[in-house]
Every structure is written in structure tokens, then in C-alpha cells.
Amino acid sequence: GIKVVEDGAHSIGSTYKYKGETYKCGDCQHVDLCTYSFHPVKHITTGEGGAVTTNDSDLFQRIQNLCKHGIDRRDHMFSDKERRGSWYYEMDSLGFNYRLTDFQAALGSSQLKKLPEIKRRRREIVKYYNQELSQYEELQVPFESPSVDSNFHLYLLRVRPGMKADRYDLFTGLQRLNYRPMVHYIPIHLLGYYKRNFGYKQGDFPVAEKCYQESL
């Protein structure tokens, strides 16, 4: 069957409810794999890098092999005659060098312990932002479903159409006040590579374009 991969780059620490049960994003109860990003802008970081979670032992072993050049040291890969020392290894398929360094892993482990407090603090800030910004009719603050407990990796405002100052003016005005706003994300089909290679053009995905034009 088709394997389902969850993009958990922004979701670490978040939970959701399904049929009355609470699940953590990345526990792979409804997917085969979940990928995490530990880029410096994420909730926790290893400087750079990421992780994959799965409950499938075959997928786990495949990932283990792929991240270290395809090298496999499990006993069943060798005959008794071949297996004469612990230095033996086999390479059944080619892989890559996707391993974190010890320093990166140590940083990530220490950051992971701080995740509950990081999430609590971010949710506290979001609550304050929502209270202060919801008074402006031109802005729509983030909505959280009762079935979700978000880590709020991003605080996304919708700039409603008809606002006196457009999004660009609002963006640059915030910059002048020493805030650091950002727009997430440019629709993929509007980027040059996808236009050239797949023939996409503006207007192909109007909902994505509208969300982009109104997001801050």
C-alpha cells in the first residue's frame, strides 16, 4: 500500500485529538513516518539537522542503513565463516552520510528537555498577541481548534482585504519599529524552478495565492 509520511517540521510538542484520544504529533499512530527539522529557527535545534520517527521496524532499519552509507552490522547479514570479528560489516545498498555529530546530538538532547517550557512560553505570548491584536478588524488572529494543542511555531496573521495600509506597508512599518515580521510562504508553483520545469503560472492555485497575499 501507499506509505504516509507526516511533515512534522513545525509540529514538535503539539498534540491533537482523534475519536476522543489524544495523540502527539510524530508518534506515528496514523502515519508510517514523521520527519522533524532541527534548523535554528525551530522550537529546538541541533544547529542543523533533523530526525525521523516510525513504529515500523523494517522502515526503521532501512533508515538506519541509509543514514550511514548503507552499512549494516547485523549478524544475519553474514555467514558463520565470514563473521570472524566485530569489524565486519556489509553494504547491501548504497546510502548517505546523514548522521548527526555527537556535539549536535548533545545540543538536541539538552534542548529537548526544555521543550515543555518553550511551548508554554510561546502559547503565553500567543495569548497576549491575540488579546492585543483582535481589537483590529483589519487583522484576523490565529484560530486554534479545540481538538488541537499547538506549539505555535509561527504566529500567522491574516491581513484582511480593504485595509488602508497594505501588507507591504504594515511589514515595513513593523521593521522600522525594530520588529522582525516575516511572510510564510511563497507558493511553490510561483517559484522559477517549478514554472520552468512544470509549466505552472500565476492563477493555477488561487486559494494558495490568496492565503499568501493575505498572510503576515
State where each predicted segment sits.
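PLP-dependent aminotransferase class I/II
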Residues: 1, 15, 19, 55-216
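Residue-level micro-sites within transmembrane alpha helices that shape
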Residues: 5, 41-42, 47, 98-101, ...
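Conserved active-site segment immediately N-terminal to the catalytic lysine
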Residues: 6-45, 87-91
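Conserved phosphate-binding and hydrolysis motifs of nucleotide-dependent enzymes
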Residues: 7, 50, 213
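Histidine-centered beta-alpha loop that forms part of the nucleotide-sugar donor binding/catalytic region
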Residues: 9-10, 39, 48, 64-68, ...
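Short beta-strand-to-turn element immediately C-terminal to the catalytic PLP-Schiff-base lysine
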Residues: 36-37, 50-55, 109
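Short active-site oxyanion
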Residues: 48-49, 115
